[in-house]
């Protein structure tokens, strides 16, 4: 199992093979992103306990680079985004965003788009507050599982900020125009039950059950065909112009033959196709 600390930048010198407690003892209060890879699942943890895991400017900048590295890691078949402790992410740490509002928004949009473009399945595991930029990140994931007691809000109207068009479209695609307007116009928080009813989250778990369910579900994800998942992700996200590309990928892979053989043999399939690296 590998754990990394990501501050202003991603550096291989930060790769650690220590439990989280050891990482915390090295840099006890500095906001950063942690990540670990275990059983083919990359888990990215937002850590800023002094500000309820609000994202600093350095963390926004670091996230796209981290995601790029994980996307190119053949050991990674799925990604979980979560917050340390009892909070997912309380948005942006405004005290670290000293440039213009446009510059701050650009950092968040770049991170959001990098997460949305991650070529493997992504899941947000949400406890506590998921507000502002936290909701922006969660919405950019493919799936969202929340613990009872989680609260969700989109709060730019409280700051006089124009919410990005890309984030607005993504929110509307999840909850529909009426609920998106409710959230954007008011900045009010909604509970996990309403988030589930409106489509903002996919599952709500009782207290103490979120980790178990996420582990259980990601185990399913990593056992499935990456070819099927990658094509379905593109099509579901609106890229319907690549039918022939994915047909060629299917013809060149052995996933379909393996899936059929495994079904007939009553065994678990061993799919070989993997997402190509950017290099």
Task: Name the predicted role of every residue range.
Residues 14, 21-84:
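Conserved CoA-thioester-binding segment of acyl-CoA-metabolizing enzymes
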Residues 30, 261-279:
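Terminal low-complexity tails and localization/encapsulation signals of metabolic enzymes
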Residues 75, 83-114, 160:
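Glycine- (often His-adjacent) and acidic-residue-rich active-site loop
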Residues 111-117, 125, 131-184, 198, ...:
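CoA-thioester-processing core
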Residues 145-150, 178, 201-244, 254, ...:
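C-terminal long alpha-helix characteristic of the crotonase
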Residues 188-194:
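Acidic, divalent-metal-coordinating active-site segment for phosphoryl/phosphodiester hydrolysis
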């Amino acid at each position: 199992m590998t754990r990394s600390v990501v501050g202003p930048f991603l550096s291989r010198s930060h790769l650690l093979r220590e439990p989280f407690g050891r990482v915390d003892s090295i840099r006890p209060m500095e906001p950063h992103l942690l990540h670990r890879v275990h059983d083919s699942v990359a888990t990215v943890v937002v850590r800023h306990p002094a500000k309820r895991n609000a994202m600093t400017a350095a963390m926004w900048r670091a996230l796209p680079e981290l995601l790029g590295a994980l996307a190119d890691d053949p050991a990674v078949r799925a990604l979980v985004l979560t917050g340390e402790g009892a909070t997912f992410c309380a948005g942006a740490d405004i005290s670290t965003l000293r440039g213009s509002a446009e510059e701050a928004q650009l950092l968040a949009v770049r991170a959001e788009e990098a997460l949305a473009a991650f070529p493997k399945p992504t899941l947000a595991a949400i406890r506590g507050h998921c507000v502002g930029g936290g909701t922006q990140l969660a919405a950019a994931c493919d799936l969202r599982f929340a613990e009872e007691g989680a609260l969700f809000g989109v709060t730019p109207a409280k700051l006089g900020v124009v919410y990005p068009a890309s984030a607005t479209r993504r929110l509307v695609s999840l909850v529909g125009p009426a609920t998106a307007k409710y959230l954007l116009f008011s900045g009010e928080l909604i509970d996990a039950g309403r988030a589930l009813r409106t489509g903002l989250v996919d599952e709500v778990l009782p207290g103490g059950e979120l980790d178990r369910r996420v582990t259980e579900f990601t185990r399913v994800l990593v056992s499935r065909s990456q070819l099927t998942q990658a094509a379905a992700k593109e099509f579901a996200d609106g890229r319907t112009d690549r039918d022939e590309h994915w047909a060629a990928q299917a013809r060149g892979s052995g996933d379909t033959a393996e899936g059929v053989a495994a079904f007939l043999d009553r065994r678990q399939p061993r799919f070989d196709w993997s997402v190509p690296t950017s290099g």
